[in-house]
């Protein structure tokens, strides 16, 4: 099982709307994430816009590819792009960070 953590930056003027959108994630998007192997997935957002994501999956590259192949993910990413500081698709611009310690 891969444990994946990633960082991104949400625009400060869009924090409230970004939070609101994630209180009501589309059912089709949730189903696609599960079907693609995304488990124990969490997103954390600091007041300065720092976003930290965490998920567990058997194969991260395969899980990314499976999501990239879905229409619902393409629509979701297109809508979410405007919330992020960096341009481009949010799911392609995340900075994955290395795990250096784990305690079970």
Can you say where each PLM-predicted feature lies in the sequence?
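Basic/polar N-terminal segments that are highly enriched at the extreme N-terminus
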Residues: 1-3, 102-104
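Active-site-flanking beta-strand signature of metal-NTP-handling nucleotidyl enzymes
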Residues: 4-9
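Short amphipathic alpha-helical segments
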Residues: 14-39
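Short acidic, gly/pro-rich beta-turn/loop elements at beta-sheet edges
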Residues: 16-18, 53, 63-65
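Short, glycine- and small/hydrophobic-rich beta-strand elements in well-ordered beta-sheets
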Residues: 30-52, 56-58
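An amphipathic, aromatic/His-enriched active-site/gating alpha helix that lines ligand/cofactor pockets
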Residues: 36, 57-94
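Eukaryote-biased recognition of C-terminal alpha-helical segments
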Residues: 95-102
